[in-house]
C-alpha cells in the first residue's frame, strides 16, 4: 500500500466515507460562556483557516466583540470527519475556526487583518512545522461582501509583502463556505484548557495596509 502525500489535495472519489452523525458539541463556549452553535440576530459569522486551529481559535476569542469561536473542519469531502481522519490527509478538509462576532464592535475587515498578520499565507500545504493540506491557509466566505473584502485584502497583503522584500506568491484560498464540521470537544478552546499547549501561530512581520 502506497503512503499518502499529505501535501497533495485529494479527489472526492478518494476521500474517506465519513458518517451521517455529527460530532457532539458542548452547549457553551468555555471562555465566553455563550452558545457554541447559536448565532444571535445581530451577530455575523466568519471562517478562517490558518494552520493548527488551537492557536487560531485563541487569537480570535481574545478579541473584543467576539461572541463565540469553534474549532472545526471545512473545505473537504468527508462528512462529519474525526481529527484522526483529517490528519490522515484523506478528507481534504482544512482545520479552521468559526468566529461569531458583533460587527458593531469588531468589523470583518479587522478580522481579516488578524488573519493576514498572524500566520504565513505563502506556505501552501503547511504552516511552519505543521505539514499537510489540513494546515493550508484559507478564507471561507459567507456573503458576497465577505468575498469582495477578502479578495481585496489579499491583493493589499500581497503588495505589502513585495514592498517588504518578500516575493513569494500568497497561497491562501478564498472560497464560499461549505459545511463546517465541529471538531471533537477536546479541541474546542484547547489553549484555555491547556495554557501551555502547542501553538504554532506566527506572522511574517508584514502589516495589512488599510483600504484606500
Swiss-Prot record:
Q: Which Pfam families match?
A: PMSR
Which keywords fit this entry according to its UniProt record?
Oxidoreductase
> Disulphide bridges in this chain?
none
- Which residues does the entry assign to the active site, renumbered to this chain? 52
Query: Where would one find coiled-coil regions in this protein?
Result: none
Region Disordered: list its residue ranges: 1-21
- Annotated InterPro entries: Met_Sox_Rdtase_MsrA_dom (IPR002569), Met_Sox_Rdtase_MsrA_sf (IPR036509), MsrA_MetSO_reductase (IPR050162)
Its BP terms in the Gene Ontology are: cellular response to oxidative stress; protein modification process
Show the catalytic activity: L-methionyl-[protein] + [thioredoxin]-disulfide + H2O = L-methionyl-(S)-S-oxide-[protein] + [thioredoxin]-dithiol; [thioredoxin]-disulfide + L-methionine + H2O = L-methionine (S)-S-oxide + [thioredoxin]-dithiol
Its EC number is 1.8.4.11
Q: Family, per the entry?
A: Belongs to the MsrA Met sulfoxide reductase family.
Record the organism. Pectobacterium atrosepticum (strain SCRI 1043 / ATCC BAA-672)
Q: MF terms per GO, please?
A: L-methionine-(S)-S-oxide reductase activity; peptide-methionine (S)-S-oxide reductase activity
Q: Gene3D superfamilies annotated for this entry? A: Peptide methionine sulphoxide reductase MsrA
Can you say what this protein is called?
A: Peptide methionine sulfoxide reductase MsrA
Q: Where is the composition biased (Polar residues)?
A: 1-14
Reported function: Has an important function as a repair enzyme for proteins that have been inactivated by oxidation. Catalyzes the reversible oxidation-reduction of methionine sulfoxide in proteins to methionine.
Cellular component aspect of the GO annotation: cytoplasm
Amino acid at each position: 500500500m502506497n503512503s499518502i502525500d499529505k501535501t497533495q489535495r485529494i479527489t472526492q472519489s478518494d476521500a474517506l466515507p465519513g458518517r451521517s452523525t455529527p460530532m457532539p458539541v458542548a452547549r457553551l463556549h468555555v471562555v465566553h460562556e455563550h452558545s457554541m452553535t447559536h448565532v444571535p440576530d445581530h451577530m455575523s459569522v466568519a471562517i478562517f483557516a490558518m494552520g493548527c486551529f488551537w492557536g487560531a481559535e485563541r487569537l480570535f476569542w481574545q478579541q473584543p466583540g467576539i461572541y463565540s469561536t469553534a474549532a472545526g473542519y471545512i473545505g473537504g469531502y468527508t462528512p462529519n470527519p474525526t481529527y484522526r481522519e483529517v490528519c490522515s490527509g484523506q478528507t481534504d478538509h482544512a482545520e479552521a475556526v468559526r468566529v461569531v462576532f458583533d460587527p458593531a464592535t469588531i468589523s470583518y475587515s479587522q478580522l481579516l487583518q488578524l488573519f493576514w498578520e498572524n500566520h504565513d499565507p505563502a506556505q501552501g500545504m503547511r504552516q511552519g512545522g505543521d505539514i499537510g493540506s489540513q494546515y493550508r491557509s484559507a478564507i471561507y466566505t459567507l456573503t458576497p461582501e465577505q468575498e469582495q473584502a477578502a479578495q481585496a485584502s489579499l491583493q493589499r497583503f500581497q503588495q505589502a509583502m513585495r514592498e517588504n522584500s518578500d516575493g513569494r506568491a500568497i497561497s491562501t484560498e478564498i472560497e464560499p463556505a461549505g459545511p463546517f464540521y465541529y471538531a471533537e470537544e477536546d479541541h474546542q478552546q484547547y489553549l484555555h484548557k491547556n495554557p501551555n499547549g502547542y501553538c504554532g501561530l506566527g506572522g511574517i512581520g508584514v502589516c495589512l495596509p488599510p483600504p484606500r
